[in-house]
């Protein structure tokens, strides 16, 4: 039997845990080794590789791509200017009429391929200005070298390709619904208890955002080692747990937290498992919640898992939804809390069915262990009745011109109750007797 600590959490007996196949945060605990041509396969799907990689690596990759393209075309422009002779220092020709001049016209300087490029730094700056379309207007390509014109066109195309790829990758990485799963919540424990006379496995899911998950549906699989009849060992044999596929109960309207129910019947892998077997079993139940994000219409998936040690036998979840005057309130402080249910059978569902045991309602427990749903319902009903009586007393007091204090309201309430009893007696005196009773009296 599991006890409770001060925080309301159930104590789980310690025993050796198996390695999780799916972690509680949804990550798969799988490592791939000895993959042939891994780099080539990942580079063949470079877009998915960039989307799946971390932000820092992606930004480093695109920064390196820009820098390499600038350096490459800067070197290309420098080579064009070098072989055209634009980098050679032109001799200083004295102006006409200057001392030592011949008074004649100065020889015309050859027209360069790229204006104002006198070294590699100038060529690199021209490459950056061309690819980023800054357009300072100081350096430009002339008609002297067609090769330089072709290089400018090619660099413009390459720059557009890099920009488009970077923007598309960043947008796809930001819009993917992977982070939406962080606001979908699974309970820390699953429970097994009786519901409608049958043993059921239950866990709770919740949505922390007000935006809905469209077409939300759940799935569950039990994973455990399995030995076939031929002696083949399957370390991770997967078997489905029916959560209402046939009748549509797997599709949920996830506005408030919902308890997912798996009925342990003949087709369930848990059919022959009782409380003692559960404590010694080695399995993992993977639960999956899928749906479309309302804002982007993209499919998201949230995952979690429960080991055998995280399933509480004979427990139920505390309620989290409370009806108030104008709305419903969801208290997420109770989301993971459970309470023990007296009278839950410890046998398996098979034994329960074979022995034809009828699960009778347990005798009323003490106030401290009273069912939370019934207690809250009674408290809510009593509060509503008290509010109605107080409103009626205030109305009567206002009609009589009295100040309705606490004592006056109590007296008026007693008067109303006494008056209702008198009215009931008067009505009973004026009502005619039943004809059937007349005939029976005459027969007597």
From Swiss-Prot:
Q: Where is this motif: PDZ-binding?
A: 442-444
Q: Which reaction does it catalyse?
A: K(+)(in) = K(+)(out)
- Positions on the Extracellular side per record topology: 81-119, 139-147
**Pfam families tied to this protein:** IRK, IRK_C
- Coarsely, its chief localization is membrane
Q: Where are the transmembrane segments?
A: 56-80, 148-169
Free-text function comment from the UniProt entry: Inward rectifier potassium channels are characterized by a greater tendency to allow potassium to flow into the cell rather than out of it. Their voltage dependence is regulated by the concentration of extracellular potassium; as external potassium is raised, the voltage range of the channel opening shifts to more positive voltages. The inward rectification is mainly due to the blockage of outward current by internal magnesium. Can be blocked by extracellular barium and cesium.
Protein name per UniProt: Inward rectifier potassium channel 4
Q: Which gene codes for it?
A: KCNJ4
């Amino acid at each position: 039997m599991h006890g409770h600590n001060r925080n309301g959490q159930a104590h789980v007996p310690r025993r050796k845990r198996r390695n999780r196949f799916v972690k509680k945060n949804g990550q798969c605990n799988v490592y791939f080794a000895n993959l042939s041509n891994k780099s080539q396969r990942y580079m063949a799907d470079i877009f998915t590789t960039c989307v799946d990689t971390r932000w820092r690596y992606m930004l480093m990759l695109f920064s390196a791509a820009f820098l390499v393209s600038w350096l490459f075309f800067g070197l290309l422009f420098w080579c064009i200017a070098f072989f055209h002779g634009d980098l050679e220092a032109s001799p200083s020709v004295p102006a006409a009429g200057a001392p030592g001049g011949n008074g004649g016209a100065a020889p015309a300087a050859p027209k360069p391929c790229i204006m104002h490029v006198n070294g590699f730094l100038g060529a690199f700056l021209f490459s950056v200005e061309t690819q980023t379309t800054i357009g300072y207007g100081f350096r430009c390509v002339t008609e002297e070298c067609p090769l330089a014109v072709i290089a400018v066109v090619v660099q413009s195309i390459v720059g557009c390709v890099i920009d488009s790829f970077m923007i598309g990758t960043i947008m796809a990485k930001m819009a993917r619904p992977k982070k939406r799963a962080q606001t979908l919540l699974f309970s820390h424990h699953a429970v097994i208890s009786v519901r409608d006379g049958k043993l059921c496995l239950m866990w709770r899911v919740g949505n922390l955002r007000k935006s809905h998950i469209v077409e939300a549906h759940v799935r569950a699989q039990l994973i455990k080692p399995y030995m076939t009849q031929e002696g083949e060992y399957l370390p991770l044999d997967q078997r489905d747990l029916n959560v209402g596929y046939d009748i549509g109960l797997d599709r949920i309207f996830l506005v408030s937290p919902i308890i997912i129910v798996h009925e342990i019947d003949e087709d369930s892998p848990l059919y022959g498992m009782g409380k003692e077997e559960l404590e010694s079993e080695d399995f993992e139940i993977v639960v999956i919640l899928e749906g479309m994000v309302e804002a982007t219409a993209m499919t998201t998936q949230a995952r979690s898992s429960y080991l055998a040690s995280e399933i509480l036998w004979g427990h139920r979840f505390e309620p989290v939804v409370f009806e108030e005057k104008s709305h419903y309130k969801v208290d997420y402080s109770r989301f993971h809390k459970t309470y023990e249910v007296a009278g839950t059978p410890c046998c398996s569902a098979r034994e329960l069915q074979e022995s034809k045991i009828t699960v009778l309602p347990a005798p009323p427990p003490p106030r401290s262990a009273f069912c939370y749903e019934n207690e809250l319902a009674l408290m809510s009903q009593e509060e509503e009745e008290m509010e109605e009586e107080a409103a009626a007393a205030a109305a009567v007091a206002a009609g009589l011109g009295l100040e309705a204090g606490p004592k006056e309201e109590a007296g008026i309430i007693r008067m109303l109750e006494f008056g209702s009893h008198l009215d009931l007696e008067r009505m009973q005196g004026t009502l005619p007797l039943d004809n059937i009773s007349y005939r029976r009296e005459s027969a007597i």
